[in-house]
Amino acid sequence: MKEFAYSEPCLDKEDKKAVLEVLNSKQLTQGKRSLLFEEALCEFLGVKHALVFNSATSALLTLYRNFSEFSADRNEIITTPISFVATANMLLESGYTPVFAGIKNDGNIDELALEKLINERTKAIVSVDYAGKSVEVESVQKLCKKHSLSFLSDSSHALGSEYQNKKVGGFALASVFSFHAIKPITTAEGGAVVTNDSELHEKMKLFRSHGMLKKDFFEGEVKSIGHNFRLNEIQSALGLSQLKKAPFLMQKREEAALTYDRIFKDNPYFTPLHPLLKDKSSNHLYPILMHQKFFTCKKLILESLHKRGILAQVHYKPIYQYQLYQQLFNTAPLKSAEDFYHAEISLPCHANLNLESVQNIAHSVLKTFESFKIE
């Protein structure tokens, strides 16, 4: 039986050639390709500065540690509970307290729920572009300006996504992207921070590499605390090659999503999120929201899909439900996040899927739901 992952890398001969060139060059790290990758990201996203990292998690930590001077009197940061846990974990690692906001039915933070969470301790808002759909940028920008907050974006899902015909990446003070193997473009593991703030860029650049400023070939100076979060040349070469194909890879995902939309239209079991999009999305995920009557048998539905070779996933368990967060904060459940978690399933959507496979998956999904016969 053929299996279909919810996402997987799309690699070709050019990608392999780019990697082999680095291996043959013997310059495996701290070479020109990481710089070229950063330059290409700036051009692709329309931003001034980009820094590539060995993961989006280390990119988040670097941003959180450097966007502003830390103050114990202003240590709360509002974010979404529907994200991969790194979004909040790195806030904890940086000394901040995450405050979780409600979400909308598209998986993004509810901008109308933010203001009531703001107080004298609030430092910033960290949004997440769920599944590749941009948050309502203007609303968040206005709120941050009104209350003198920093606007940071975890755009790990959203490379190539747009808001009002402009690419995500330049709206917040800084934005983080992920190049993990299941993202629209990949470096196996990897990430980036982009910003138009030159001072912040320099701080993060030092933090990424031991806080060290090289004066010349044999001598340097340590200016601040730092880590080794660099992306090596092998990964940078792969990223550079993948980025050239980003529009094509996005188009393939869009074609798959549109095929799902057509087959799923007006079905009685679930609502796909893709038809609700107003702006271009990376389509990192293809989420569906099951109708409430299916909530109690979600695990059985997922098991049935997997038996059919459809390796669906769930994105995400609310972060505050994890044991660590319950022990630290004992956060009360947020109904919007709870409902989303109970309803959401991510179906296979990636550039390796041909349309015949997408059609077969879609019809198998409908048959799976039909087999449960819940009134």
UniProtKB/Swiss-Prot annotation:
Database matches in Pfam families: DegT_DnrJ_EryC1 (PF01041)
Effect of K183R: Strongly impaired catalytic activity
UniProt family annotation: Belongs to the DegT/DnrJ/EryC1 family.
Source organism of this protein record: Helicobacter pylori (strain ATCC 700392 / 26695)
Effect of mutating H180N: Impaired catalytic activity
Catalytic activity from the UniProt record: UDP-4-amino-4,6-dideoxy-N-acetyl-beta-L-altrosamine + 2-oxoglutarate = UDP-2-acetamido-2,6-dideoxy-beta-L-arabino-hex-4-ulose + L-glutamate
UniProt keyword Transferase present: yes
NCBIfam families per UniProt: PseC
Descriptive protein name: UDP-4-amino-4,6-dideoxy-N-acetyl-beta-L-altrosamine transaminase
Keyword vocabulary terms for this entry: Aminotransferase, Pyridoxal phosphate, Transferase
Annotated residues for binding of substrate: Y6, K26, Q27, L28, T29, A56, S178, N228, Q313, V314, H315, Y316
Organism lineage: Bacteria, Pseudomonadati, Campylobacterota, Epsilonproteobacteria, Campylobacterales
